[in-house]
């Protein structure tokens, strides 16, 4: 279940970030203007100029066979770059958390097993100013579109123009940081940045901006949804489409980049089919029948008890457990603070005390989950259990009251209940906080300061979400809080999410050890009222803005870690999310005809590196 939440939010927006530890200085600080093959945000790059492949791939993997994967949801577009189809685009086209960039590509590709590091892809060389005021790319002369046309500097210039004019967040807003883009050679293009930019922004241009084909895109209709198979530079082309049901990709035998070091061991299936299902139950049944090749598991009860069918016993279905080295993703109930009922932080804090993790974990999840506490859970970036250091206190000094004392000194933790489902200790604390906020309790109802019964809606989009919402609803009702759970279809959910038309949702945030500009889209004041942004909670706090600025300005590891921890403390103290839980591992079941590399990178398993084994 957790994996489905994370996959949904990953699929609609994945900043080009990876995760690992950080070095002290930017790579090549003494000679950053020299063309090179890689860029690193902090620290040296791990692979030499003559590297042959990423260490988590099998360069000898066979190129054959097919992969059929199921996802929950629907789609009605093949345009992932505009607001209209932001959350209804078919999976796999670009920047997909599971499938990668099958059709569209970026100038450089991130490694999943080292610091925030990018390697050559469409651009064979990169040069960057030591102050990161400009970056210049030299395109690979072999780069071609799927129709055989060369990828040119004009395509890069066109991409900048079209995304600035008609692109969705974050593409359109990002481009305002570019002061000038110019052709500097037959295959070279330079981006010069203005005062809005920061040290991370060149990395985002390199690793997160798609390059689009000027000759194959109609500028007048680019803002529309479309089901026309696109022209891309990636390893796959769209073979067939059944809207809302299925999209099939075919490996391009003429893919220009198949021998690049950054592509060896990837893209091993001749055909990839993504099948859409209404719910996980039907998806799992299809997997059991062998219709699907893999099943990405997020339900601990199912993992523990329902893999008892014959194919498992016969060894034909294999259960794999993968360990990641990145922070746990954040899953939580999200308060929409644009709603007056959630404007008071004491109210949010009180409601956060009323989620009984111990009861839910034992009764719903076979005790497999761990409680999430931090937005960078389980990493050196987490503030939980650590008192603020001198640099953090310096950053936070201008914002008295932004961080609660227990969060500042590292003693804060979510409540641990007796697991009965009706522990009175957190309920009493919640009662006291609501009373301080002006609530009264009459006839079994919580009455807000305006004299109205305290009531709100939790919007969900699946039976699994509804199940955990029901558990929360039960605890809230004990304090007289009336909660209605409204499960809507995927299209309605996406529309309401995009326009912030909800009281509370279950929200998921992908975490990394290299947080950067995506934090503006999640928490920045400027994103609060931007439709399609990921500021689900409606955060608009000067302290948050200042901490984001600090982490982006950091030039060394110590300052970066302090800034992220300070941001973590402000977010925890703001009570914008009720943190729920996470799995300590990744679980994937596969039929034995599918194989994967032995090495798992820091970011976890990488589906684009798997292959088919049958003759």
Curated annotation (Swiss-Prot):
Transmembrane segments: none
UniProt superkingdom: Bacteria
Residues spanning the signal sequence: 1-29
GO molecular function, one term: peptide transmembrane transporter activity
Main location: periplasm
Keywords for the protein's UniProt record, in alphabetical order: Periplasm, Signal, Transport
Localization (cell): Periplasm
Pfam name, any one: SBP_bac_5
Gene3D superfamilies in UniProt: Dipeptide-binding Protein, Domain 3, Periplasmic binding protein-like II
Example GO biological process: peptide transport
Keyword Isomerase: no
GO CC terms in record: ATP-binding cassette (ABC) transporter complex; outer membrane-bounded periplasmic space
CDD domains per the UniProt record, alphabetical: MbnE-like
Family that this chain belongs to: Belongs to the bacterial solute-binding protein 5 family.
Protein name per UniProt: Putative binding protein BRA0576/BS1330_II0571
Species per Swiss-Prot/TrEMBL record: Brucella suis biovar 1 (strain 1330)
Upper taxonomic lineage: Bacteria, Pseudomonadati, Pseudomonadota, Alphaproteobacteria, Hyphomicrobiales
